[in-house]
UniProtKB/Swiss-Prot annotation:
Record region (Disordered): 1-32, 285-359
Name of the protein in question: SWR1-complex protein 4
Lineage: Eukaryota, Fungi, Dikarya, Basidiomycota, Agaricomycotina
Assigned keywords, A-Z: Activator, Chromatin regulator, DNA damage, DNA repair, Nucleus, Transcription, Transcription regulation
Localization terms from the record: Nucleus
Organism: Cryptococcus neoformans var. neoformans serotype D (strain JEC21 / ATCC MYA-565)
Amino acid sequence: MSAQDVRSILSLPPSTPLPTLSSSKKVPVPRKPDGITRELYALIGDNAPSLADAQASLAAVKYREKPALKGKKVHWEWTKFTPAARRDNPVRLGHWARITDSDPNDSVEYFGKFNLHGPSVMEYSQFEYDQHLVDPNWTLQETEYLFELLKEYDLRFIVAADRYAYVSPEGEKRKRSVEDMKDRYYTICRRLIRTRTASDPVHQQHLIQAYAFDKAREIKRKQYASDLFHLTPAEIAEEEALYVEITRMQQNERRFRADRDELMRSVMGLDSGLVEVDQSAMENAIGVDKNKKKRKAEDESAAPSPAPTPKKPAPNAGFDNSRCIYHLPTPSNANSLTSHLSQKHPPHQQAFLRGSRLPLPKPTAAGRITDLLAELGLSANRLVMPTRQNMEVFEGLLNAAAALVEMRRQVNRVEQELRVVRMQKEGLMPVTTNPSARVKGEAGVVTGGSEATVKAVTPVKEC
């Protein structure tokens, strides 16, 4: 038995400490690859891609296999079918159809369920045609042919015009344009809507507007579009030059208008251009002396009247039209032109502050209103936030304060009259014809019976 075994049996510590394993493992340092200098590898660090790692990552990719669809067996066959739109004239056609195991004999046309009719065509009776729908350019047979054609092609006027081949009973072939067909159909629709009784007049008016059609305007529009489409390069260049010139003229007009507004604003304080200006204000601004004008008018009235001026010849209409001369109509009175201008251009209003348009109280009540607002902690001069809502509320407050001051004045007046009447009733004051006489601050002598009593009447301050 060795000494180490004895120490182990007696649970004694070993004489020398046992060697302990290091907890930190050495991290393997990657070796510098061949062909790269040490300085370049130090700059790259651990960001250098490894071809082996890339190949290993690509090898680890597992592509997903194509899923195996567990569906029913489907195959295509050439089958015969009858078009759903030709029930009256059945035609057997063939097409490739997908046949499933569940329904191998299914030969119904798939697109038959989509064969729906388009917009409905209005119908009329013989009585309605005789009363409201007669047109000298259209016969009854041709109108019926038109409606049948539109019903067959679902109101597609372009297709109907291409298929239009009406032959009159006399053997005459007639060709109608798209505008003729539209004009005839929409005219009949409008007449039927007007003549038939409608439960909702508003809906009836909407329908009439929906069927509105102007044949002349449509023809003119198509002609204009055709002319634009067939323009030559020279005409296109000319139109572009005209457009550039018009744009330049509009820019100059805007610039001239801005300069004119700026001039009017700087000279007279106006915010717009040519407006109707008060003549008296213009005279005051220019500084015309009215006394001089009055004196001049008196001198002219005192002077002898001049000889009557020869009457101008009447204007010749042909001469004026050839030289593009236009004569303004002479107003019957001086105010006719002014009234005409005022209708086109309303009187000018300069920019103003909302606070300046508040109604001012009466001078006699202004002080009392100011005192009343001061008691409420408000200022009668200005608001901190003079917005539109605040100005409206402040205006209402001023009106209420004025009404309150007026009410207080009336109450004081009535109380004073009652006081005077009571004193007259008690015999302290002589009866006067005016019971509303104010009692001043002097002493009054009142006769009561055989004694004379001097009473001092307390003055009452009138509000």
